[in-house]
Amino acid sequence: MGKGDPKKPRGKMSSYAFFVQTCREEHKKKHSDASVNFSEFSNKCSERWKTMSAKEKGKFEDMAKADKTHYERQMKTYIPPKGETKKKFKDPNAPKRPPSAFFLFCSEYHPKIKGEHPGLSIGDVAKKLGEMWNNTAADDKQPGEKKAAKLKEKYEKDIAAYQAKGKPEAAKKGVVKAEKSKKKKEEEEDEEDEEDEEEEDEEDEEDDDDE
């Protein structure tokens, strides 16, 4: 896969991302020679962020707002290279894809695992949920699978109705276009008939002159 456009503006950063960046810079100043354990460092940042007051977080939120404004300004003048495919527009009103049985299972047990093991990373929580799902008996999975099947059925009906919304207009335009075409054809035929009648009249006049 080819790399993205190097001239494209860098994506905007969140307030938490600015906070982590500051933490990393502080850590480098204090322990310039020490190697960083990413998982441990990430957990420490997360815990510190949770204990911070709204006033303390405000500084980073202001930085994020300024970065967002800067990013949006740059994106207005950014011209993507030729051949780059644009992202497909997502309609916010379009029906959302239904969750799978496994996703419903994760939604139910995720808070429980986080409560029992608050220090676990996102990756470890996902791994644990996967193991739990694999060890769950088929009978115990059935309620979730039935619920997922119902949601899928509803989604298919909703998406069909959503996609059909634009069709009546298109069909209407098609009818109007056909009617215009028919009318034009009739007008052309009428003009041809008039021309034929004129030619016949001229011929009759010529015959009268000959007599």
UniProtKB/Swiss-Prot annotation:
Gene3D superfamilies with a match to the protein in the record: High mobility group box domain
DNA-binding region location: 9-79, 95-163
Tagged with keyword Lipoprotein: no
Subcellular location: Nucleus; Chromosome
Region annotated Disordered, chain positions: 71-96, 161-211
Highest taxon in the source lineage: Eukaryota
Modified residues (N6-acetyllysine): 3, 7-8, 12, 28-30, 127-128, 172-173, 177, 180, 182-185
Pfam families recorded: HMG_box, HMG_box_2
GO biological process: regulation of transcription by RNA polymerase II
SMART domains: HMG (SM00398)
Keyword tags: Acetylation, Chromosome, DNA-binding, Nucleus, Repeat
UniProt xrefs under SUPFAM superfamilies: HMG-box (SSF47095)
Biological role: Binds preferentially single-stranded DNA and unwinds double-stranded DNA.
Family per similarity comment: Belongs to the HMGB family.
Descriptive protein name: High mobility group protein B1-like 1
